[in-house]
């Protein structure tokens, strides 16, 4: 009897872990075996995809995603989350960002394929400074031209308001103070709180976009074929 009990104990000790392990093997494709405990890994990946400095599917871009990104920046008086959807039929490659004031804690996404959207954030400089989050970012398109996006979240709303703008420049052109001044002062900058539609006049493209009016600003832009 004692030998039987020992045998039964050893049998159970070996078989139970094996039975649990088999539940983790979900599918087998070719020479690759997909192993998972449950859906938590997949859900975590989906949740972490929509972060500043990332590229997501263009169809996923929405104001609620930008709100989530803003929350991750923390309590800063002036900040902005930017989402630009590439439906141009072209590939974009990052050039640079110029800041009139403020900074960013993330890197501008390097490549944005067609039907993808870039996510980016900016904020005022850290510390008790009366500055906003103001600048322009530039992407070279596979057409050879440059897409520029200007954003302005000022510190003093008694004198200024949120503004944004988009322009396509001939050839490759990095963002700088001259580009910023042109988009802010001379190229019909766009006011917040309204959906704007505009022909960009280059590469057969147009824009559709919206910017909120508060200090926790969200800017969503769709660049599309005309």
UniProtKB/Swiss-Prot annotation:
Any single Gene Ontology cellular-component annotation: nematocyst
GO BP term (any one): monoatomic cation transport
Signal sequence, start to end: 1-21
Subcellular location: Secreted; Nematocyst; Target cell membrane
Keyword DNA-binding: no
Role noted for this protein: Pore-forming protein that forms cations-selective hydrophilic pores of around 1 nm and causes cytolysis. Pore formation is a multi-step process that involves specific recognition of membrane sphingomyelin (but neither cholesterol nor phosphatidylcholine) using aromatic rich region and adjacent phosphocholine (POC) binding site, firm binding to the membrane (mainly driven by hydrophobic interactions) accompanied by the transfer of the N-terminal region to the lipid-water interface and finally pore formation after oligomerization of monomers.
Name of the protein this chain belongs to: DELTA-alicitoxin-Pse1a
Organism: Phyllodiscus semoni
Phylogenetic placement of the source organism: Eukaryota, Metazoa, Cnidaria, Anthozoa, Hexacorallia
């Amino acid at each position: 009897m004692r030998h039987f009990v020992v045998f039964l104990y050893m049998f159970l000790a070996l078989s139970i872990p094996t039975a649990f392990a088999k539940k983790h093997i979900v599918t087998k494709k070719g020479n690759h075996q997909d192993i998972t405990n449950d859906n938590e890994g997949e859900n975590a990946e989906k949740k972490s995809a929509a972060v500043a400095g990332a590229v997501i599917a263009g169809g996923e871009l929405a104001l609620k995603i930008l709100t989530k990104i803003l929350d991750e920046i923390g309590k800063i008086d002036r900040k902005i989350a930017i989402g630009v959807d590439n439906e141009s039929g072209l590939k974009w490659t990052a050039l640079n960002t110029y800041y009139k004031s403020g900074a960013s804690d993330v890197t501008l996404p390097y490549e944005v394929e067609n039907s993808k959207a870039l996510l980016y954030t900016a904020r005022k400089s850290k510390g008790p400074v009366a500055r906003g989050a103001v600048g322009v970012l530039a992407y070279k398109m596979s057409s050879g031209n440059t897409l520029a996006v200007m954003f302005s979240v000022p510190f003093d709303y008694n004198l200024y308001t949120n503004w944004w703008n988009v322009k396509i420049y001939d050839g490759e052109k990095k963002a700088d103070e001259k580009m910023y001044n042109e988009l802010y002062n001379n190229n019909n900058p766009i006011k917040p709180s309204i959906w704007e539609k505009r022909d960009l006049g280059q590469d057969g493209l147009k824009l559709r976009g919206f910017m909120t009016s508060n200090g926790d600003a969200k800017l969503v832009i769709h660049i599309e074929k005309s």
